[in-house]
Amino acid sequence: MAMRQCAIYGKGGIGKSTTTQNLVAALAEMGKKVMIVGCDPKADSTRLILHSKAQNTIMEMAAEAGTVEDLELEDVLKVGYGGVKCVESGGPEPGVGCAGRGVITAINFLEEEGAYEDDLDFVFYDVLGDVVCGGFAMPIRENKAQEIYIVCSGEMMAMYAANNISKGIVKYANSGSVRLGGLICNSRNTDREDELIIALAAKLGTQMIHFVPRDNVVQRAEIRRMTVIEYDPTAKQADEYRTLARKVVENKMLIIPNPITMDELEALLMEFGVMEEEDESIVGKAAAAEE
């Protein structure tokens, strides 16, 4: 099969890296050849696959070596569980420079060094938070990733971020081949969460590709720096990630999304009881004034 390049976006803290690594572990278990490119200065996109605290990043090693041209592919590419290839782009120290530049530098380096030529089935880009700047949009802006999956939950800000990311996809979809493959609901156990994300997906013109339930085995595995697939392959949660992997492999629904307005998003949240009807009479009133 031709190599598929997928980017995983979503609100910060939503569980993108955990979801991506468990999905990738399930793909590796299926016999797929996969590479993860971490596009986040935290460099935590590969820790569960490599059983390490944080992988040395391309930007760190380039700074030590002098320039990125002084690096070799084997310096930055590590192989972990199931033969998964792992690379972290990294970024500058907090408050210094543009982390998005790290993503651009890393992907260009990997291309020049032939990292993509090794009969890979999938490349996954695990991308920082929202599409916050042009650098982080690089995997979709430069037509590197053709498929985008957005990790979200039934919480308002996660849905707001999913809608914002959809706007970013539209911006680049019209001039390139990038498409939205679906929403992955990483459950926070909010009320009617699966129905809400199915409804949001329908409004965006996409699908909820899978609902990943909340399970404490994920945290138990993470403490050991392992995916659930490796830590407890018999766990029900491991089967959830296997189902997600199978759905991604079989996914043919790749669309240009139809982002909604803030008013439409709020109306959806009110419909499902996540947000109360707006009452102008209470706006700006402190608790003491309401007594």
UniProtKB/Swiss-Prot annotation:
Pfam families registered for this protein in UniProt: Fer4_NifH
Domain of life: Bacteria
EC supergroup of this enzyme: oxidoreductase
Catalytic activity, as annotated: N2 + 8 reduced [2Fe-2S]-[ferredoxin] + 16 ATP + 16 H2O = H2 + 8 oxidized [2Fe-2S]-[ferredoxin] + 2 NH4(+) + 16 ADP + 16 phosphate + 6 H(+)
Keywords associated with the record: 4Fe-4S, ADP-ribosylation, ATP-binding, Iron, Iron-sulfur, Metal-binding, Nitrogen fixation, Nucleotide-binding, Oxidoreductase
PROSITE patterns named in the record: NIFH_FRXC_1 (PS00746), NIFH_FRXC_2 (PS00692), NIFH_FRXC_3 (PS51026)
Sites where the protein binds ATP: 10-17
SUPFAM superfamilies given in the database record: P-loop containing nucleoside triphosphate hydrolases
Listed GO biological process terms: nitrogen fixation
Residues the record lists as binding [4Fe-4S] cluster: 98, 133
EC number: 1.18.6.1
Annotated TM spans: none
CDD domains: NifH
Names of the cofactor(s): [4Fe-4S] cluster
Post-translational modification: The reversible ADP-ribosylation of Arg-101 inactivates the nitrogenase reductase and regulates nitrogenase activity.
GO molecular function: 4 iron, 4 sulfur cluster binding; ATP binding; metal ion binding; nitrogenase activity
Modified-residue entries (ADP-ribosylarginine), positions: 101
Cofactor note: Binds 1 [4Fe-4S] cluster per dimer.
HAMAP family: NifH
Function (record text): The key enzymatic reactions in nitrogen fixation are catalyzed by the nitrogenase complex, which has 2 components: the iron protein (component 2) and a component 1 which is either a molybdenum-iron protein, a vanadium-iron, or an iron-iron protein.
Family note: Belongs to the NifH/BchL/ChlL family.
Assembly and oligomerization: Homodimer.
Further facts: This subunit is associated with the molybdenum-iron nitrogenase component 2.
Protein name (Swiss-Prot/TrEMBL): Nitrogenase iron protein 1
Organism: Azotobacter chroococcum mcd 1
Gene that this polypeptide is encoded by: nifH1
